[in-house]
Amino acid sequence: MSGETATGDVNKIVMLTSTATRPNGSNRKVKAYIGRSTWAPPGTVYLPGASTNISEQFNGNGFLVSGKDTNQWGAVGSGSASPILGIATSVPASTTEVTSTLGSSKYSLVTGLGSNPSVNTATTLDVAQLATDLINSNVSVLNLQADDYSTLDFGTSATNPKIVHIQGDSHVKCGSGNHPTAVGYGVLIVDGNLTTTGLFRWDGIVIVRGTSVSISGGGSGGSTIWGTLLAKQPASSSSMALTIAGSSNVTYSSQAIKTVTDKWPSAFSTNSRIIAWNEMM
């Protein structure tokens, strides 16, 4: 493939050739193409932990959590990847609690894999370890102190994503109209609690390592995340509170996530698989 080097794997595929020699001297040769599965989050919103350690609020009828693949800044469902869960938990009791809190009148506001509401238990993801691996990925990390942010560009475009590490609580907010002033592309890691309001936009992965995350906004549009929102699993003596309100949207985007996994692949471990093979002789 054009651009491939000994140390630069462009297409992320390895070709292996195996030759077997029989006692009579005849040979059989097989060529296999090995690649890695595409990384995908457990759900658009991942809320791990025992039901006694999590709480959630879904305020209003204007929000949307969707596991339908969506291209960045596109219509819901405009992507081509398979859908994932709208909200994923790590234990069945938490799935029951989230579904009950949501209430039947809001089932249609959480879509994705399966029927509405798209809420179910999924394979556990170590969010804390993922955050650590990203921070330690030997790239330039934008480290910020706990604060309110309203006019920063956290990564200027989909082709120039950043890892943004806020070391404490943060309120990320934005102005009015259709011109968000707090935008970002890449990975946002918040060590404390995260609150977003107004027209905040993020393309990629948002990781919250505190005890609460609130995604809200009003008017003609609310906070929007294209990609995934991952909460750290709370310790047995701690908790995690999730609030989704207003006209906010959290939408799965394999396109936005691929920007991250391509930029920092070492942080995302996936299983190897045979993509294709053929017998050569």
Where would I find each of the regions flagged by the language model?
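Short, ordered "entry" segments at domain starts
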Residues: M1-N136, G155-T159, I163-M281
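A Trp-anchored, charged/polar loop motif used as the substrate-binding/catalytic surface
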Residues: L142-D153, H171
